[in-house]
Amino acid sequence: MSVSCCCRNLGKTIKKAIPSHHLHLRSLGGSLYRRRIQSSSMETDLKSTFLNVYSVLKSDLLHDPSFEFTNESRLWVDRMLDYNVRGGKLNRGLSVVDSFKLLKQGNDLTEQEVFLSCALGWCIEWLQAYFLVLDDIMDNSVTRRGQPCWFRVPQVGMVAINDGILLRNHIHRILKKHFRDKPYYVDLVDLFNEVELQTACGQMIDLITTFEGEKDLAKYSLSIHRRIVQYKTAYYSFYLPVACALLMAGENLENHIDVKNVLVDMGIYFQVQDDYLDCFADPETLGKIGTDIEDFKCSWLVVKALERCSEEQTKILYENYGKPDPSNVAKVKDLYKELDLEGVFMEYESKSYEKLTGAIEGHQSKAIQAVLKSFLAKIYKRQK
């Protein structure tokens, strides 16, 4: 099926679900940008469109001519995709569409542009699913997004490893089918390959600090934490969506290193939030049970605790951090409260927001300012 045919079919699907005046997703800037933050109806329409594109992409993959599916294997992949790709908040994927709209500076998106920006957004959601399926196995996690981790679902187990590999390969099937005739196709492939490598390297740094028998809090520092976060989270969660939108808009990524730097800083702020929520948020609100303490993670909280601990408090931290027993975890959490790490985080959040806002407002392009502000608005003071 050609790209144009896919777009026509998508258009028919969208017209049934969404009023015609919502088919063109308008770019928003200035006062309209503020209205976008306040308007739930437009976000609902965008999400409906986005989910329609997921159905098209999933159908493509379930009928990929490169593999002769049996009914059983097709049903497995169908279920696996819905469980792992479709079940998140979709913030990364939707951010591609939001960013591209803002870069268009008030011009209506064509039906094909809507489809392609959504398709790129879904490639990032596929990448996220691939990382999380394997990350949950490595961390021996229990829940993800309010339900059992995929590998803990009955009859899945270690088949989840192969499912992760499938998810990774699906990305390039989508890119080839829908973008190979675009002038930025090679740049897209390079971008996804580079970001995947960066994320895998960040995961490696994170994992090798937690070897059994080699746990040493002395090697944890803010610089190590930043390095892990920059590579493991910031590039794929913050830079990748904007980079995809910039490529679709005909931009050269080498001309936007300053944008990358702001997004990396935003990604670090996001991960510090994540570290804080892992310990202090309600698991039901968060959608998962935090295990950073048990897993001996190089968390921002433990790094800040090490900076503030007395000799006696340091001893308590060394004796209890990285142990799975609930009593050990409770002692670490009690210590965090004693050190007022909640207050330390609140101060960090306020200063980070001020710094990021200043960097964004200093950018010469109003369209790029709007893109960066939209990202910051989505994460500032988030609860999950």
UniProtKB/Swiss-Prot annotation:
Pfam families referenced in this protein's UniProt entry, alphabetically: polyprenyl_synt (PF00348)
Xref: Gene3D superfamilies: Farnesyl Diphosphate Synthase (1.10.600.10)
Database matches in CDD domains: Trans_IPPS_HT
Metal-binding as UniProt keyword: yes
InterPro entries, A to Z: FPS1-like, Isoprenoid_synthase_dom_sf, Polyprenyl_synt, Polyprenyl_synt_CS
EC number, as in UniProt: 2.5.1.10, 2.5.1.1
Residues where Mg(2+) 1 binds: D135, D139
Residues annotated for dimethylallyl diphosphate binding in this entry: R144, K232, T233, Q271, K288, K297
Compartment(s): Mitochondrion; Cytoplasm
GO annotation (BP), single: farnesyl diphosphate biosynthetic process
GO function term, MF aspect, one: dimethylallyltranstransferase activity
Cofactor binding remark: Binds 2 Mg(2+) ions per subunit.
Cofactor or coenzyme needed: Mg(2+)
Chain sites annotated for binding isopentenyl diphosphate: K89, R92, Q128, R145
Expression (tissue specificity): The FPS1L mRNA accumulates preferentially in inflorescences, whereas the FPS1S mRNA is predominantly expressed in roots and inflorescences.
GO cellular component, one term: cytosol
Reactions this protein catalyses: isopentenyl diphosphate + dimethylallyl diphosphate = (2E)-geranyl diphosphate + diphosphate; isopentenyl diphosphate + (2E)-geranyl diphosphate = (2E,6E)-farnesyl diphosphate + diphosphate
Organism domain of life: Eukaryota
UniProt keywords, alphabetically: Cholesterol biosynthesis, Cholesterol metabolism, Cytoplasm, Isoprene biosynthesis, Lipid biosynthesis, Lipid metabolism, Magnesium, Metal-binding, Mitochondrion, Steroid biosynthesis, Steroid metabolism, Sterol biosynthesis, Sterol metabolism, Transferase, Transit peptide
Pathway noted in the entry: Isoprenoid biosynthesis; farnesyl diphosphate biosynthesis; farnesyl diphosphate from geranyl diphosphate and isopentenyl diphosphate: step 1/1; Isoprenoid biosynthesis; geranyl diphosphate biosynthesis; geranyl diphosphate from dimethylallyl diphosphate and isopentenyl diphosphate: step 1/1
Residues given in the record as Mg(2+) 2 binding sites: D135, D139
Functional summary from the UniProt entry: Catalyzes the sequential condensation of isopentenyl pyrophosphate with the allylic pyrophosphates, dimethylallyl pyrophosphate, and then with the resultant geranylpyrophosphate to the ultimate product farnesyl pyrophosphate.
Family recorded in the similarity comment: Belongs to the FPP/GGPP synthase family.
Protein name: Farnesyl pyrophosphate synthase 1, mitochondrial
